[in-house]
Amino acid sequence: MLDLAQPRPTDLALDVATGTGNTALALAPFVRNVVGVDLTREMLDQARRVTAERGITNADWVLGDACRLPFGAESFDLYTVRAAPHHFHDFDAFLIEALRVLKPGRAAAFVDCAPPAAARDVMHQVEVRRDPSHVRSLTVDEWTARLKKAGFEVEVAKSRELDWDFEDWMGNMEVQPALAAELAALIEAADGEARAQLHPERRDGKLWHAYWHCLIRARKPA
């Protein structure tokens, strides 16, 4: 995220859907101040504890919704969001809000799951059963189109393919073994182009498959 966001020492940065503040705290040494915003009070409380433990003095935490940010227009020099947009029910409102709170000429960095089109249907079936809060993952091309529609100028839009440990992924959400087995079977049953993209395989009895993140930097016109 840091390479993508290109933070500057004078920046007032906003990290949206910050969770426990991992991205915001990674930005903190490189910016003047960072604000983390999240819908979940308990997550923000944990972020505050970590901030105090590390002696970080330039990070603040605000309760708020990515689609209705509690900030004025043109308030921030940098906007970041990681691993959250696939949960948003109103994707266009999220992008409009991102554009609104950015100062003219300043950039936003987006990282999220972004499977290619052929694999997406299979992965969507898996994602929504693993985590019911999942709404939809966009492809990189869809991200680019939606950002341009919202008024952004897209500077970087690329996909990073990862070698994904299915068992660990299920464990992160404490998925019950019977359901995990069903979801593994969905991936292993993929055919055609979806299978070629997912390339599932067993290694020492464990399922591995491809997973994708988009890495996007877009700028508000000056």
What residues fall within each predicted segment?
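Class I SAM-dependent methyltransferase SAM/SAH-binding core
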Residues: 12-68
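A short acidic, Gly/Pro-enriched loop at the edge of an enzyme's catalytic core
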Residues: 67-78
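Conserved alpha-helix/loop element of class I SAM-dependent methyltransferases that forms part
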Residues: 1-11, 26
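A short glycine-rich, Lys/Arg-flanked "PGG" loop and its adjoining helix->strand segment in the class I
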Residues: 92-107
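Conserved class I S-adenosyl-L-methionine
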Residues: 107-134
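Conserved Class I S-adenosyl-L-methionine
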Residues: 20, 150, 155-222
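A short SAM/SAH-binding and catalytic strip from SAM-dependent methyltransferases
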Residues: 77-90
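Short alpha-helix
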Residues: 136-150
